Amino acid sequence: MRIGALREGFEGEARVAVTPSSAGHLMKLGHEVFVEAGAGARAGFSDDSYRAAGVTVVPSAAELIRSVDVVAKVRQPSEAEIGQMQPGQTLISFFYPAQNSELLAQAKEQGITAIAMDMVPRISRAQKMDALSSMANIAGYRAVIEAANNFGRFFTGQVTAAGKVPPAKVLIVGAGVAGLAAIGTSVSLGAQVYAFDVRPEVAEQIESMGAEFVYRSEERRV
């Protein structure tokens, strides 16, 4: 099977669907791997690093799409990218079909098989393919780091000769994968952390991480 990774066109997107290392694993399984020129540049992978791994680097998206059976991306494809694909080809990417119903209809009309990585269920059997949770974990961590950078003072409390500085108070709304990552990061930075979720049953998990669960006024703590 011929697998190709497109360069991401979204402004600021630095990720790439296939790295030289992952390409090596695919080739060991007997597949041919292609990447569009410059696809990995913003992720720190030069075209030469792909060539050294045995990957074929092609100059354009159109040529890559014509050359492969499976097209891999990180973000959802554009209408133009879908338009260049042929019946029988497979697309693997984040797709968000509920938000991109017209794009999904276009793919269906052209006879393209679309595998939406954002729809992979969070079960043990699919854990290695759960790219969405991995990205959510990073997003939760990064959100707190960015907030701390813009906060203007320490997250943790300080005791100095000049007096005390109280810890920052952080409220995390939502205790999904990203929220739990944000809670863990905030606690590790020394903040006083509060968290809310519409599911009161997650209170124990939140409190086990060192945060305080915020109940709605009508809820009773058992």
Stretches with model-predicted labels:
Residues 1-106, 110:
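An N-terminal-biased, well-structured beta-alpha scaffold segment characteristic
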Residues 179-180:
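N-terminal Rossmann-fold NAD(P) dinucleotide-binding loop
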Residues 34-45, 189-216:
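NAD(P)-binding Rossmann-fold cofactor-contacting core
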Residues 174-176:
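Glycine-rich Rossmann-fold phosphate-binding loop(s) that bind the pyrophosphate
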Residues 219-222:
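Conserved small/polar residues in nucleotide/adenosyl-binding loops
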Residues 2, 8, 79-169:
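Glycine/serine-rich phosphate-binding loop and adjoining beta1-alpha1 elements at the start
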Residues 28-32, 55-56, 70-73, 109-113, ...:
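Generic secondary-structure signature for well-ordered alpha-helical cores
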